[in-house]
Amino acid sequence: MEILMTVSKFASICTMGANASALEKEIGPEQFPVNEHYFGLVNFGNTCYCNSVLQALYFCRPFREKVLAYKSQPRKKENLLTCLADLFHSIATQKKKVGVIPPKKFITRLRKENELFDNYMQQDAHEFLNYLLNTIADILQEERKQEKQNGRLRNGDVDNEDNNSTPDPTWVHEIFQGTLTNETRCLTCETISSKDEDFLDLSVDVEQNTSITHCLRGFSNTETLCSEYKYYCEECRSKQEAHKRMKVKKLPLILALHLKRFKYMDQLHRYTKLSYRVVFPLELRLFNTSGDATNPDRMYDLVAVVVHCGSGPNRGHYIAIVKSHDFWLLFDDDIVEKIDAQAIEEFYGLTSDISKNSESGYILFYQSRD
């Protein structure tokens, strides 16, 4: 058995090496970007949800640069961010241009910190992205808080900071955070009230044979509040019919869009996949911005896509397609392949109905040009 396993591992390593050398030849030494590395990630038992998101984030350059800068800071106690920084640094400093890396330390830490991921079952890539970004932000805010406290103690200032004060935004917020404004207009007095809400990613409903632009417009459709759903107007001091709509007030540097492809079906008593064909362009501009939005004409370029392959949330596989310099790559755990830009169309989804086995875009990462 031991010999068989060793032979199997050796065969696997040989295959990885063959894939790596083929990719290097396909790109060519003259075209290969300086200081760039393309490394697949070993799957530790249904960890493709994690691998695909990590590859997408690695090729979101502002995020990668901040994580690598964090690595260069004085050594800190191990946490999820230090493990991520070690992984990114390991990829970025490899002598080889292409290859495979086992993200074992990161996966071990992830499973230790959150029981949701402490198993060998398929997890949701969007849940993982959400958890990762929020955890990193929490770590950075806690470290900043500790630094302030240590600074005050050194200066002899023992007064505690107001615990209710809003924490300063971190570089996670600077990169991914946008702001939505919820506008409600009373149909009696025409008074408009608005409430702001921050987001790190936007979850949008999907419809058959549409585009991401259409889905985003639907996200901002006007909703009429009437009957038992009437809105309490402060001006009228009574419940009134009203129009409500959501607009984008602040556009993020990197816009992460989550396509809501998993829907609970009452008759089936389970979630099923909406394999609808949703076109996502290489260039994107948002049209549902508020009147007071900063830089409302901001243009975005698609830099990465997390793709779900399969027919349901608990069955299937995740891969990532990323843009690096002027070409596109597909990361399927330890396999890395160069693909044509036209091949992205294969990941839009299917024109047929639900519950189909499909490879469809699930999380889109758009980076601002400015």
UniProtKB/Swiss-Prot annotation:
<dbReference type="GO" id="GO:0101005">
    <property type="term" value="F:deubiquitinase activity"/>
</dbReference>
<keyword id="KW-0645">Protease</keyword>
<feature type="binding site">
    <location>
        <position position="236"/>
    </location>
    <ligand>
        <name>Zn(2+)</name>
    </ligand>
</feature>
<dbReference type="GO" id="GO:0046872">
    <property type="term" value="F:metal ion binding"/>
</dbReference>
<dbReference type="InterPro" id="IPR038765">
    <property type="entry name" value="Papain-like_cys_pep_sf"/>
</dbReference>
<dbReference type="GO" id="GO:0016579">
    <property type="term" value="P:protein deubiquitination"/>
</dbReference>
<dbReference type="GO" id="GO:0005886">
    <property type="term" value="C:plasma membrane"/>
</dbReference>
<comment type="similarity">
    <text>Belongs to the peptidase C19 family. USP12/USP46 subfamily.</text>
</comment>
<dbReference type="GO" id="GO:0006508">
    <property type="term" value="P:proteolysis"/>
</dbReference>
<protein>
    <recommendedName>
        <fullName>Ubiquitin carboxyl-terminal hydrolase 12</fullName>
        <ecNumber>3.4.19.12</ecNumber>
    </recommendedName>
</protein>
<keyword id="KW-0479">Metal-binding</keyword>
<feature type="binding site">
    <location>
        <position position="186"/>
    </location>
    <ligand>
        <name>Zn(2+)</name>
    </ligand>
</feature>
<feature type="compositionally biased region" description="Basic and acidic residues">
    <location>
        <begin position="146"/>
        <end position="157"/>
    </location>
</feature>
<comment type="function">
    <text>Deubiquitinating enzyme that plays various roles in the regulation of the immune response and inflammation. During TCR engagement and activation, translocates into the cytoplasm and deubiquitinates its substrates LAT and TRAT1 and prevents their lysosome-dependent degradation to stabilize the TCR signaling complex at the plasma membrane. Plays an essential role in the selective LPS-induced macrophage response through the activation of NF-kappa-B pathway. In addition, promotes that antiviral immune response through targeting DNA sensor IFI16 to inhibit its proteasome-dependent degradation.</text>
</comment>
<dbReference type="GO" id="GO:0005737">
    <property type="term" value="C:cytoplasm"/>
</dbReference>
<keyword id="KW-1003">Cell membrane</keyword>
<comment type="subunit">
    <text>Interacts with WDR48. Interacts with WDR20; this interaction promotes translocation of the USP12 complex to the plasma membrane. Component of the USP12/WDR20/WDR48 deubiquitinating complex. Component of the USP12/DMWD/WDR48 deubiquitinating complex. Interacts with PHLPP1. Interacts with RBPJ. Interacts with CBP; this interaction blocks the acetyltransferase activity of CREBBP.</text>
</comment>
<dbReference type="GO" id="GO:0005634">
    <property type="term" value="C:nucleus"/>
</dbReference>
<feature type="active site" description="Proton acceptor">
    <location>
        <position position="317"/>
    </location>
</feature>
<dbReference type="InterPro" id="IPR028889">
    <property type="entry name" value="USP_dom"/>
</dbReference>
<dbReference type="GO" id="GO:0004843">
    <property type="term" value="F:cysteine-type deubiquitinase activity"/>
</dbReference>
<dbReference type="GO" id="GO:0050862">
    <property type="term" value="P:positive regulation of T cell receptor signaling pathway"/>
</dbReference>
<dbReference type="GO" id="GO:0005829">
    <property type="term" value="C:cytosol"/>
</dbReference>
<feature type="active site" description="Nucleophile">
    <location>
        <position position="48"/>
    </location>
</feature>
<keyword id="KW-0378">Hydrolase</keyword>
<dbReference type="InterPro" id="IPR018200">
    <property type="entry name" value="USP_CS"/>
</dbReference>
<feature type="domain" description="USP">
    <location>
        <begin position="39"/>
        <end position="369"/>
    </location>
</feature>
<feature type="binding site">
    <location>
        <position position="233"/>
    </location>
    <ligand>
        <name>Zn(2+)</name>
    </ligand>
</feature>
<feature type="region of interest" description="Disordered">
    <location>
        <begin position="146"/>
        <end position="168"/>
    </location>
</feature>
<keyword id="KW-0963">Cytoplasm</keyword>
<dbReference type="Pfam" id="PF00443">
    <property type="entry name" value="UCH"/>
</dbReference>
<keyword id="KW-0833">Ubl conjugation pathway</keyword>
<keyword id="KW-0472">Membrane</keyword>
<dbReference type="InterPro" id="IPR050164">
    <property type="entry name" value="Peptidase_C19"/>
</dbReference>
<keyword id="KW-0788">Thiol protease</keyword>
<dbReference type="InterPro" id="IPR001394">
    <property type="entry name" value="Peptidase_C19_UCH"/>
</dbReference>
<feature type="binding site">
    <location>
        <position position="189"/>
    </location>
    <ligand>
        <name>Zn(2+)</name>
    </ligand>
</feature>
<keyword id="KW-0539">Nucleus</keyword>
<feature type="short sequence motif" description="Required for plasma membrane localization of USP12/WDR20">
    <location>
        <begin position="1"/>
        <end position="4"/>
    </location>
</feature>
<keyword id="KW-0862">Zinc</keyword>
<dbReference type="GO" id="GO:0004197">
    <property type="term" value="F:cysteine-type endopeptidase activity"/>
</dbReference>
